Amino acid sequence: METQSPSIIRRFATATWAHIRVDPLLFTCFFTLSFAVVWPFWVGEFLPFLDIPQHLATIGVMHHYDDAAFDHAAYFLVDTSSTQYLLYYLTCDLLADWVGVEDANRVFISLYAVLLPLSVAYCLGAWGRLKLAALLAYPLVFNKFLFFGFINYVFAFPFLFFGLGLMKCMLDSLRTAPGRST
């Protein structure tokens, strides 16, 4: 009986973790810098991003839409088909059940801050480059787009690098596929 190959998501997650955990120094640097880059999101009372108050208000309306105490349904209509922030809003809305709207926002932004360097490390590893160079992605977490509050835009950066690395892995697997003549 022929065994099936592991799913692409499992291979992706295993390869991402393998790119980091092989080198203890690299793992320590990633862990320390991830803490350092996430810490500013949690120490202040307010995040210094331009559009965050409007995003928090929108997430708050979505989260308390059916709550009679707020009566948002009388004044607002939630239309999820006309926003480019859908992943951000829905994720924060789900997280808000456990941690509140503001902390859900902090969790989402922290996730971006950790995923960006990890995705760069995955991409560099897939292309056979020095994974240590991914540490240079940490200063890039704090960019103009983040401070303007374009959360959906900056959250796409990790997907870009994960996608480039995944594309390289898939191209390599096609080249080495059994029965493929080169």
What are these regions (language model features)?
Residues A57-H64, F76-V101:
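Short hydrophobic/aromatic helix or loop-helix immediately within or flanking a transmembrane segment
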Residues V107-A126:
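Transmembrane-helix motifs of polytopic, lipid-linked glycan transferases
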Residues F148-A156:
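Short acidic/glycine- and proline-prone juxtamembrane loop motifs at membrane-interface regions
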Residues V120-F142:
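Transmembrane-helix signature of polytopic, membrane-embedded enzymes
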Residues G128, G163-S181:
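Membrane-interface transmembrane helices that cradle and orient dolichyl/undecaprenyl
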Residues M1-V38:
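Start-transfer (signal-anchor) and selected internal transmembrane alpha helices
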Residues L25, G100-F108, L130-A133:
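Membrane-interface starts of transmembrane alpha-helices
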Residues W39-D71:
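Extracytoplasmic loop-helix module adjacent to an early transmembrane segment
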